[in-house]
Amino acid sequence: MKTKTILLSLLCIVGITTATAQSDVYYWKDGKAVKLETVDSLTFNAPEHFDFAAQWVDLGLSVKWARTNVGAAGMTDYGTYFAWGETTGWTSDTNYAKNNFEWTERDVDALVDENLTLLLSRDAAHANWGGSWRMPTREEFQELKDNCTWTWYDDYHHTGVAGYYIASNKPGFTDNYIFLPAGDLFVGPNKPNPKKEHPIGYYWSSTLHTHGYDYAFYLELRDSRCVVDEATSEFGMLVRPVLAE
């Protein structure tokens, strides 16, 4: 019987599923999950360095989505919390209040373009990852909602992290997915509590709300629903970058 041994970096493996005596092995290539055929053994080599920022997922949408949040070490890591329009993450000792902002309501016009979208210079994803990475717009969050299947996990793959497994519904892309961990948020001096009984996730968009200069759109994740809503911009939320080509 012909055998095949595959040497793969540990973090490049998408998943291994077992049914009776057979195993299906997938690896990550060019933003897609690719199935390996006739695999009898695997050898894992730990990489010296893995650039998560370089890993994107093609869900068949208008933009590609990052596998991780800004500041995260992996898919289930929450990453860094940002106030809207700020590019430096705040620490757990910081009070997310308006008097600690770099900007005020009076100069918010200098942060956005004519479409009320954050300038790249004020975009946390672009400032931290560079290249063509940026924060998603309100419309791109809605596109993600409308074209994917969203499955809530209280404990994703026994990591202790709650969040949504989001799989594409687009033909040709249905094996591709991202995971958005529910990391809660900073509200004034109150710190995130992602381990509470009913975790919630909050992700900033780059879109300013039209009815007030101190509000911006965000994606809210709950076990019962996910919605695009608006919130006051000093809240500390997570950022999931998108890649616009």
Listing of model-derived features with the role each one plays in the protein:
Residues M1-V25:
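Bacterial Sec-dependent N-terminal signal peptides
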Residues L8-C12, E37, G60:
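Compositionally biased amphipathic helical and low-complexity segments enriched in hydrophobic
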Residues T20-F52:
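Sec-dependent signal peptide cleavage junction
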Residues P47-E245:
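Conserved positions within compact, well-structured domain cores
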